[in-house]
């Protein structure tokens, strides 16, 4: 349910997916969650997908965007996996060593353009001032995705930990979950660090992370009488199941 919303697995506006593509995309996600694929590997499979959106269902991630431009891919990927709403203006918050302009090459080659064309001879300047020259035979998309999903990139793990916390409690340790900024600090930095360390140490195992959250003292504590309850919107699937249970009509 949550993943379907995040990955826009639907054929209605604003997605541009055919119904058959949606079914294949949903099945791809279902199989990964059923097999408990590590989060980093699932994201790599998603972002490195190419080819037919029926034979390679994860390609629907890219096809679902209204604006299929390098900038839009960039902003949406960083919003989803790094929690950054405005990476174009604040690229330093997303990349520790890579600048925005220096990561456009691979996005210009996803599915739509010639992946074998020669890269432009631009300079790549790292955060420490080191200047690198693009290598012609480098797969820039793979380089970016491997950096994004690596355990060294803690933000990638932190954002997933925070999403799961939000799904359980209705409010993230960083709230909103998609708004990671210098002036939007975690409400409990130690809890976020502890869960992130656990998530990385267990090879991005999402089931173990969810289990740890559900067994936490926070989740199992009684609510304070004067405490504030955080209302949560029911997902569409839960509403449908509730109506089916009441009416006895499941088809």
Language model region names:
Residues 1-132, 138-146, 150, 155-200, ...:
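Short, structured secondary-structure elements
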């Amino acid at each position: 349910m949550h993943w379907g919303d995040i990955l826009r697995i639907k054929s209605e506006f604003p997605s541009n997916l055919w119904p058959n593509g949606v079914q294949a995309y949903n099945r791809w996600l279902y199989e990964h969650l059923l097999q408990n694929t590590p989060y980093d590997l699932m994201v790599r499979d998603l972002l490195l997908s190419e080819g037919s959106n029926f034979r390679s269902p994860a390609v629907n991630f890219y096809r679902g965007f209204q604006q299929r431009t390098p900038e839009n891919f960039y902003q949406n990927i960083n919003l989803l996996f790094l929690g950054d709403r405005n990476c174009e203006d604040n690229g330093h918050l997303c990349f520790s060593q890579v600048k925005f302009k220096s990561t456009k090459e691979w996005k210009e080659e996803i599915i739509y353009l010639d992946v074998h064309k020669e890269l432009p001879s631009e300079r790549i300047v790292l955060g420490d001032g080191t200047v690198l020259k693009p290598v012609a035979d480098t797969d820039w998309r793979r380089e970016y995705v491997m950096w994004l999903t690596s355990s060294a990139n803690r933000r990638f793990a932190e954002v997933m930990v925070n999403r799961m916390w939000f799904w359980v409690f209705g409010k993230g340790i960083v709230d909103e979950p998609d708004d990671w900024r210098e002036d939007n600090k975690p409400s409990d930095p130690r809890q976020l660090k502890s869960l992130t360390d656990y998530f990385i140490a267990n090879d991005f195992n999402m089931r173990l992370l969810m289990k740890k959250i559900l067994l936490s003292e926070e989740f199992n504590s009684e609510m304070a009488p004067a405490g504030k309850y955080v209302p949560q919107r029911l997902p569409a699937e839960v509403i449908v199941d509730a109506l089916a249970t009441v009416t006895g009509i499941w088809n």
